[in-house]
Design a protein with these regions (language model features):
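Extracellular Ig-like/FN3 beta-sandwich strand-entry sites
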Residues: 21, 112, 124-126
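Residue-level recognition of secondary-structure-to-loop junctions
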Residues: 109, 115-123
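Short amphipathic, basic-aromatic surface patches that mediate peripheral association
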Residues: 28-60
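Solvent-exposed loop segments of extracellular immunoglobulin-like
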Residues: 62-69
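C-terminal edge beta-strand
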Residues: 140-148
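Short, compositionally biased P/S/T/A/G/V-rich stretches that sit at domain boundaries
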Residues: 1-16, 29, 34-35
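Short, solvent-exposed loop/turn segments at the edges of extracellular beta-sandwich modules
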Residues: 134-138
Length: 150
């Protein structure tokens, strides 16, 4: 397994206005390891039983699968990402959109390897956004700066 590579497309310093969406395109290259375990044929009844089952391990287990997540590294206000981003930290709640959550499934990988996300800012200021490509075993980060005006 080698780390996936996340490369932000476009300028590393961008400008926008409050309320206007910025398109964040990121190319992700990965070797396909570790292998993703996708159980998409699970029935609703089996899913309900799995949700109610007590943990079987004392340590938190991360679900393997390539994903990309954008987050705010520094900034004054709230940033809304669309689609909503998986959390790159341990959040074990079932519906937390985190690889450590019991029912989380990795999102589909775009055919061309380029993930498209929009970011909308609610306050002016300078924001540093970071993106993480994570395959469940290793990860790679990239950063951009966005200057937001009124």
């Amino acid at each position: 397994n080698i780390p996936p590579i996340a490369t932000s497309q476009g300028d590393n310093i961008r400008s926008t206005r409050v309320g206007e969406a910025v398109i964040l395109s990121t190319q992700v290259i990965d070797d396909g390891l570790p292998v993703t375990r996708r159980d998409q044929t699970i029935t609703e009844d089996a899913l309900r039983r799995r949700m109610m089952r007590p943990p079987s391990k004392l340590t938190v287990q991360k679900i393997n699968g390539l994903f990309l997540a954008w987050n705010v590294y520094r900034g004054e206000g709230k940033v809304t990402f669309d689609p909503p981003m998986p959390k790159p930290w341990e959040d074990t709640r079932t519906a937390a959109n985190s690889p450590w959550g019991a029912l989380w499934l990795p999102p589909e990988i775009p055919e061309d390897g380029i993930y498209e996300v929009t970011a909308t800012f609610d306050e002016p200021g300078t924001y540093i956004l970071w993106t993480r490509a994570d395959d469940g075993g290793l990860y790679h980060d990239d950063y951009i700066t966005v200057n937001v005006t009124e």
